[in-house]
Amino acid sequence: MKSLIASLAVLAVLVPSIAVAADDRCPIESLSIDDITKGISQAPTCDAALKMFQKCSVGTSGDIGIGAVVTQKCEALFEGKLSTQQKRAYSQARHVCDTKYAKEDGTMYRSFEAFCRAQAAHKVAMPFFQPAASKGK
């Protein structure tokens, strides 16, 4: 009886973890960089694109093109809408991303740069996200 209770306790801990892990998987079956890039370009929003990038990144220089798609999708939300001060701040954030790992060798650092740029664009785009309630109107 004790072993049954112990087994159930272990299952109670593992089952939610398995469900969370499944949710964190890349939704793109193939995992080829071209397919990931295409899938992210078809994401409905900047936010969805960034989340997909986080789940599907490869951790190498292959993330440069994938991150560029996310960055472009997010930049489209605020293009022509930023004040001079906001443009300057975004430019500074991009500069930080471009220089932070510039002296580091290795493709993972190019991935870090791509993530940094995508996250900077996402942060600037956030005030321009459409509220969920108004999407159907």
Question: Where in the sequence are the language-model features?
Answer:
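Sec-dependent signal peptide recognition
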Residues: 2-9
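N-terminal signal peptide c-region/cleavage motif recognized by signal peptidases
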Residues: 14-18
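Mitochondrial intermembrane space
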Residues: 22-137
